[in-house]
């Protein structure tokens, strides 16, 4: 196993690992799913419409992360077909544009929390029994620089999105504290401003660039750092 400058131990490939990626049909999620497959993982690509999953080497998985029944059935299917699960990438997200809190529509808040925070909670909850059967299973959850509450970075609107990503930080810290001694490696990642349907055409990063650090985190070997926020292969403050 190679050593990174951060002292993180990386798996050289993911052969034999089973991974599920939510929101895997476009943008960063599609790039993550493709890269995990190239590393040898068996990839389940979660989507609200499984017909949108076109990669022949991926298993299309119906999974609206706001539908608890679909999430449960998706994880049950992975268990039936594979008997194990090693990597969960919580990527599905929404980004409603809004001004400051007093201008926000509460329906936007509810929808954003349902997808961006409750979704990762539900997926991880149902996946945990399988994840904990292995050694060093990984949970990677997409966060954002807009959810960092240090360095005076919480102004500028988008309250629903910002608060949902603050919650992702709490989820990540909780998973490490609660399950880290059982071998779970849980981290969050800021992919940067990426040219996607959410990020818009003016964003400086390509989806493949945005996927690099999430895929890197999915390669973390047992005992690697957990409960942290990362960007560009480096730890950053919450």
Locations of regions flagged by a protein language model:
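Conserved NAD(P)H cofactor-binding loop of Rossmann-fold oxidoreductase domains
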Residues: 91-98
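N-terminal Rossmann NAD(P)H-binding glycine-rich loop of SDR-like oxidoreductase domains
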Residues: 25, 33
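Catalytic loop of short-chain dehydrogenase/reductase
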Residues: 94, 106, 110-113, 132-181
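C-terminal helical subdomain
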Residues: 181, 188-189, 200-238
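Active-site Tyr-X3-Lys motif and surrounding loop/helix of classical short-chain dehydrogenase/reductase
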Residues: 73-80, 99-114
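Rossmann-fold cofactor-recognition segment
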Residues: 57-69
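Hydrophobic positions on the long internal alpha-helix
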Residues: 89, 123-127, 131, 171-172, ...
């Amino acid at each position: 196993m190679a050593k990174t400058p951060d002292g993180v131990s990386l798996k050289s490939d993911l052969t034999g690992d089973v991974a599920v990626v939510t929101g895997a049909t476009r943008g960063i999620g599609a790039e993550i799913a493709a890269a995990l497959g190239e590393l040898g993982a068996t990839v389940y690509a979660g989507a609200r419409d499984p017909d949108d999953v076109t990669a022949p080497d991926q298993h299309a998985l119906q999974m609206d992360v706001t539908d608890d029944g679909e999430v449960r059935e998706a994880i049950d299917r992975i268990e039936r077909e594979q008997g194990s699960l090693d990597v969960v990438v919580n990527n599905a997200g929404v980004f409603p544009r809004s001004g400051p809190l007093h201008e926000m529509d509460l329906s936007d808040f509810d929808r954003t929390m349902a997808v961006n925070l409750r979704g990762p909670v539900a997926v991880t909850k149902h996946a945990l029994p399988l994840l904990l059967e292995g050694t060093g299973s990984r949970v990677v959850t997409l966060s954002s620089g807009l959810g960092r509450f240090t360095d005076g970075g919480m102004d500028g609107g988008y309250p629903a999105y910002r608060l949902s990503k603050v919650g992702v930080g709490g989820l990540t810290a909780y998973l490490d504290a609660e399950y880290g001694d059982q071998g779970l490696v849980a981290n969050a990642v800021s992919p940067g401003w990426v040219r996607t349907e959410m990020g818009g055409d003016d964003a400086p990063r390509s989806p493949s660039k945005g996927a690099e650090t999430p895929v890197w985190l999915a390669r973390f070997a047992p005992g690697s750092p957990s409960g942290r926020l990362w960007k560009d292969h480096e730890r950053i403050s919450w």
